[in-house]
Swiss-Prot record:
Pfam families: Aconitase_C (PF00694). It comes from Paracoccus denitrificans (strain Pd 1222). One of its GO terms (biological process) is L-leucine biosynthetic process. Pathway: Amino-acid biosynthesis; L-leucine biosynthesis; L-leucine from 3-methyl-2-oxobutanoate: step 2/4. GO terms for cellular component: 3-isopropylmalate dehydratase complex. InterPro entries: 3-IsopropMal_deHydase_ssu, Aconitase/3IPM_dehydase_swvl, AconitaseA/IPMdHydase_ssu_swvl, IPMI_Swivel, LeuD. Heterodimer of LeuC and LeuD. The keyword Amino-acid biosynthesis applies. The gene is leuD. This is 3-isopropylmalate dehydratase small subunit.
Amino acid sequence: MDKFTTLTGIAAPMPLVNIDTDMIIPKQFLKTIHRSGLGKNLFDEMRYNPDGSEIPDFVLNQPAYRESQIIVAGDNFGCGSSREHAPWALLDFGIRCVISTSFADIFYNNCFKNGILPIVMPQEVVDVLMEDAKKGANARMTVDLENLTVTTSDGQSFPFELDPFRRHCLLNGLDDIGLTMEKAGAIDTYEAQMAQSRPWV
């Protein structure tokens, strides 16, 4: 998993509330077990017409936001059914951070396991960030995980809170496997001791 320290990039404004996981990645794309390749189907039914042509008004189809790395979203982002494909699709598109007033719990937890930083901020702050994101590609937002701040293109800085353990994992690029591998030495020692003391196990 890639480390997340400081991210400066284009932020896409998505003020719609209750964006659920089926909107993020529709059910017909859940057959794969591969994390790569889902980015093209991110927000599929919002991005494309039935004939496969792009819907010009959708934010990620607009030239200014095609390279977005941050989403500033409406309340309750990631609600709906549990599917890890949702953060997979976001990450494969290039999204590393989503900012909202609230997230569905399962989606929130899945983000951390896949290298995406979900940030919860008060409505008044999200409103400011949403307006900054509407400035387009020339307005770059900065998310500083080390200092726990989000800074707008005009220099306004807002603090956010995050569980220290989750912050540690993102800063060091540690998913569940990475955390286990940190203990590889201790695991090997334990197994060697068990082989000596309980060879029948």
